[in-house]
Swiss-Prot record:
EC number annotated for this UniProt entry: 2.8.1.13
Region (Interaction with target base in tRNA): 95-97
Protein name, as recorded: tRNA-specific 2-thiouridylase MnmA
Enzyme kind, highest EC tier: transferase
Record bears the keyword Cell wall biogenesis/degradation: no
Length: 361
């Protein structure tokens, strides 16, 4: 029997529940831990943390494992949410899930688990950890449609050395099948979507409570005024919905897309047509780099990159590499490259790391 102690982050969802189940079957001393990362407006209408905790508790009872609830909302506000607001205020579109993983789920949670005497932590992420000669690699999850390595690229060697991903080798359908077979009550529970602290709440309504609104003009690239925006923070590159632009006399009937923002003049730029050249970029610049091995990848080697979750891998090369910034060139132009989002670099199934997109050409 393997009596190593592992603390499993249990969200109330099927993935983390099956992760706990598998570890228990493998003989680990399993402790469940439910993380509460957000306090404000935790109402039934928009946020389901109370229901999620009850689901996690129900599974813990069935598995006969202890479940602890811990509140990381102060850490979340300081390390994740404050940066989220600052990025939006600067006109960028951040991905808080990336920071939540590196700062909360694999830092605050890991520290707490170690204080409980844990040897390992585990989560229900679709990813895998391999150790080769004392180096820990982060690999894509086996289920390509659910792979979550994109959100985990900021993890370091110390974090990965303590991490188990029990369902990383499984497909989602297999996870649900295991949950159903063992009578877990959340076997058919819907996957959570959206940003964790916003829940199902309308995004503009949420952001408007924290940042001042500054409406302005919407321009075409040749300077024609075609509408008014509600505040640059509400829009992201490539956005089509919610622009409120009607038909232009003698103009094209193709849909409008956001192509850029000018924070100095408070102008939102739009173009018509999904394949407009202004929406395509052949290279990007990234900063705040994080490399899983601790060392940067080779310049000029052919790698693959994702500039958004679930994107098909795009062949690329690192054409300039400095201490904390790099330029990445693509074999084919990429659509909707968005400042504030993460670019993540892969070598086959191995996630090497990445950075935050700052610019593109």
């Amino acid at each position: 029997m393997n009596k190593s102690r592992v603390v499993v982050g249990m969200s109330g969802g099927v993935d983390s529940s099956v992760a706990a189940l598998l570890l228990k079957q493998q003989g680990y001393d399993v402790i469940g831990l439910f993380m509460k990362n957000w306090e404000d407006d935790d109402t039934d209408e928009y946020c389901s943390s109370r229901k999620d905790f009850l689901d996690a508790a129900s599974v813990a009872d069935i598995l006969d494992i202890p479940l602890e609830a811990v509140n990381f909302s102060a850490e979340y506000r300081e390390r994740v949410f404050s940066l989220f607001l600052a990025e939006y205020q600067a006109g960028r579109t951040p991905n808080p899930d990336v920071l939540c993983n590196s700062e909360i789920k694999f830092k605050a949670f890991l520290d707490h688990a170690l204080a409980l005497g844990a040897d390992w932590i585990a989560t229900g992420h679709y990813a895998q950890v391999h150790e080769i000669n004392g180096q820990f690699q982060l690999l894509k999850g086996e289920d390509g449609n659910k792979d979550q390595s994109y959100f985990l690229y900021r993890l370091n060697q110390q974090q990965l050395s303590r991490t188990i991903f029990p369902i990383g080798h499984l497909y989602k359908r297999e996870v649900r099948k295991i949950a159903h077979k063992h009578g877990l009550p959340n076997s058919t529970k819907k996957d959570s979507t959206g940003i964790c602290f916003i829940g199902e709440r309308p995004f503009r309504e949420f952001l408007n409570r924290y940042l001042p609104v500054d409406p302005g003009e919407i321009h075409t690239l040749d300077g024609q005024i075609v509408g008014e925006h509600q505040g640059l923070m509400y829009y992201t590159i490539g956005q089509r919905q919610g622009l409120g632009i009607g038909g232009i006399r003698e103009g094209s009937e193709q849909p409008w897309f956001v192509s850029g923002k000018d924070m100095q003049t408070n102008v939102l730029y739009v173009v018509q047509g999904h394949d407009h050249p202004a929406l395509l970029r052949s290279s990007l610049t990234a900063a705040d780099l994080s490399w899983i091995s601790g060392a940067p990848p080779h310049q000029s080697w052919v790698y693959a990159a994702k500039i958004r979750y679930r994107q098909t891998d795009a062949p690329c090369a690192i054409i300039r590499l400095e201490h904390d910034s790099c330029q990445i060139g693509f074999a084919a132009p990429q659509w909707g490259v968005t400042p504030g989002q993460s670019v993540v670099i892969y070598e086959s199934k191995v996630c090497l790391g990445g950075g935050i997109i700052t610019d593109s050409v």
